[in-house]
């Protein structure tokens, strides 16, 4: 028997079904992928995309819009691009790239996107911040007048670094650039300065070794390691310094002090050159794109010392009366000591000074291999501790005179007494500037060594016994005048009483002959 349906029932059922459907209008800007090659995607149809915007691709993959052309967009993929195909849907997100920030990152190793890669579980960070940010304006900045101690006598005495300064570390490969920066990070233990170490284009084994050394020396607890290793894409190597800078700025904005090491910006420039050439941007000098100067200047200008007003405004009054700082130690690798190449000259002109490390000095056993003649700190002098500033003036003069006379003495057979004394003093100063790796020196010990050589107490000590003498002298003062050593380390002051104590202590130690 056929079933009969009442037309009114059918219409009621249809009405009920239509009313139950929840429709929402969503405006979405979509395009389609036209090509994928070498980490670069070309997308057709994204009319409203912004420069630097995140573009969503299938399989939870994102790309960064870099080239906005008349009818297509050139974007660089952040992560794996093997699964992308021509015709895939690309969507705009309306967001720019952000990374996690906060104290939760201290002691962790993350990639350029802020994702943990150390196997210690999730970060637990609750805040994020954009990787690109405009540097603090002139009105919000304060002059650099507080020191960052690296623990190296040669640097702290002759090329002092201040909080908020940008000091370039430049030299050929295998001259101790990373060692100097890592020792500076280790020396911040107990000072309250938070550190960020950005490894760009390095071997994964090298990064693992650095992390292990930081852990062994108790420095990982105050350090964030951002790693974009050689096996990662050019996009990750390009982004990583900006991500690390954002993590450091978190502390600066809240009235704290931070130190960031970019190791090294030469590899970032190479990664950016690769991206630019793949995006068909016109090449310039050494095939770098025209904006390679801006690549580094916008990064390094974010390192600053900001005023109390800036911190108060940023924290909405939660933090008052405190200045913040971000000190940058960018590293540049030169080829055969050529500091006049494109990227080195760019970074030299952006920074507030440079520490030049030389292969010949390194091979001669003078480590750190600092060339005191062409190394300079343009603003750090105002930040030097009183005691080091007072004592270190003679060091530079002794070394400059020694270099001049040493060249002359090669041709002269008979030297007068004054010249011979200057040569011997210069030899001792050069020897005294040597220092072992992972052994940063306190302010008091540095001052003691410099005072001893300046006042001629080392003139009768054989050059090959100098470092043993220095070690014994430091131990003698730690045992007999521990209170004075602690006072100098905490205040950095200098007066006649301290000078008298130094004089008496050194003379006492010399009589023991225990070196």
Swiss-Prot record:
Its EC number is 7.1.2.2. One of its GO terms (molecular function) is ADP binding. The record marks 375 as: Required for activity. It is found in: Cell inner membrane. The keyword Cell inner membrane applies. Disulfide bonds: none annotated. Coiled coil: none annotated. GO terms for cellular component: plasma membrane; proton-transporting ATP synthase complex. It catalyses: ATP + H2O + 4 H(+)(in) = ADP + phosphate + 5 H(+)(out). It is a peripheral membrane protein. Produces ATP from ADP in the presence of a proton gradient across the membrane. The alpha chain is a regulatory subunit. F-type ATPases have 2 components, CF(1) - the catalytic core - and CF(0) - the membrane proton channel. CF(1) has five subunits: alpha(3), beta(3), gamma(1), delta(1), epsilon(1). CF(0) has three main subunits: a(1), b(2) and c(9-12). The alpha and beta chains form an alternating ring which encloses part of the gamma chain. CF(1) is attached to CF(0) by a central stalk formed by the gamma and epsilon chains, while a peripheral stalk is formed by the delta and b chains. Belongs to the ATPase alpha/beta chains family. HAMAP family: ATP_synth_alpha_bact. This is ATP synthase subunit alpha. It comes from Xanthomonas euvesicatoria pv. vesicatoria (strain 85-10) (Xanthomonas campestris pv. vesicatoria).
């Amino acid at each position: 028997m056929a079933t009969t349906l009442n037309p009114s029932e059918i219409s009621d059922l249809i009405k009920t079904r239509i009313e139950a459907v929840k429709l929402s209008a969503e405006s979405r800007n979509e395009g389609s992928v036209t090509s994928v090659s070498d980490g670069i995607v070309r997308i057709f149809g994204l009319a409203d995309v912004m420069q630097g915007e995140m573009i969503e691709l299938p399989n939870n993959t994102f790309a960064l819009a870099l080239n906005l052309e008349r009818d297509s967009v050139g974007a660089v993929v952040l992560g794996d691009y093997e699964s992308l195909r021509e015709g895939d849907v690309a969507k705009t997100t309306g967001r720019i790239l952000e990374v996690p920030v906060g104290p939760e990152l201290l002691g962790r190793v993350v990639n350029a996107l802020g994702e943990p890669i150390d196997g210690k579980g999730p970060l637990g960070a609750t805040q994020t911040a954009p990787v690109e940010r405009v540097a603090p304006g002139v009105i919000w900045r304060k002059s650099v007048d507080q020191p960052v101690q690296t623990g190296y006598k040669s640097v702290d005495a002759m090329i002092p670094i201040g909080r908020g300064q940008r000091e370039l570390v430049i030299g050929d490969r295998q001259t101790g650039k990373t060692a100097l920066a890592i020792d500076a990070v280790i020396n911040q233990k107990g000072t309250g300065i938070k550190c960020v170490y950005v490894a760009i284009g390095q071997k994964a084994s090298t990064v693992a070794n650095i992390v292990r050394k930081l852990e062994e020396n108790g420095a990982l607890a105050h350090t964030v390691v951002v790693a974009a290793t050689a096996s990662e894409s050019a996009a990750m190597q390009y982004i990583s310094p900006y991500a690390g800078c954002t993590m450091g700025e978190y502390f600066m904005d809240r009235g704290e002090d931070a130190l960031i090491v970019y190791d090294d910006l030469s590899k970032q420039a190479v990664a950016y050159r690769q991206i630019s050439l793949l995006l068909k941007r016109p090449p310039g000098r050494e095939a770098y794109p025209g904006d390679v100067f801006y690549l580094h200047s916008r990064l390094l200008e974010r390192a600053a010392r900001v005023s109390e007003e800036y911190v108060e405004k940023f924290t909405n009054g939660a933090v008052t009366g405190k200045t913040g700082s971000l000190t940058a130690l960018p590293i540049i690798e030169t080829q055969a000591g050529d500091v006049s190449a494109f990227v080195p000259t760019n970074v030299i002109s952006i920074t507030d000074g440079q520490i030049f490390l030389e292969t010949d000095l390194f091979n001669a056993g003078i480590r750190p291999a600092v060339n005191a003649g062409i190394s300079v700190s343009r603003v750090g002098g105002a930040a030097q501790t009183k005691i080091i500033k007072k004592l270190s003036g003679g060091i530079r003069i002794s070394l400059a005179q020694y270099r001049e006379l040493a060249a002359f003495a090669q041709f002269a057979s008979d030297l007068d007494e004054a010249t011979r004394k200057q040569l011997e003093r210069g030899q001792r100063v050069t020897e005294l500037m040597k220092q072992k790796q992972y052994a940063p020196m306190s302010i008091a010990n540095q001052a003691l060594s410099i005072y001893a050589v300046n006042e001629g107490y080392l003139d009768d000590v054989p050059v090959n016994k100098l470092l043993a003498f220095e070690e014994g002298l430091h131990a003698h003062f730690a045992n007999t005048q521990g209170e004075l050593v602690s006072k100098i380390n905490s205040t950095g002051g200098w007066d006649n009483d301290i000078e008298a104590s130094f004089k008496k202590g050194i003379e006492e130690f010399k009589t023991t002959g225990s070196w």
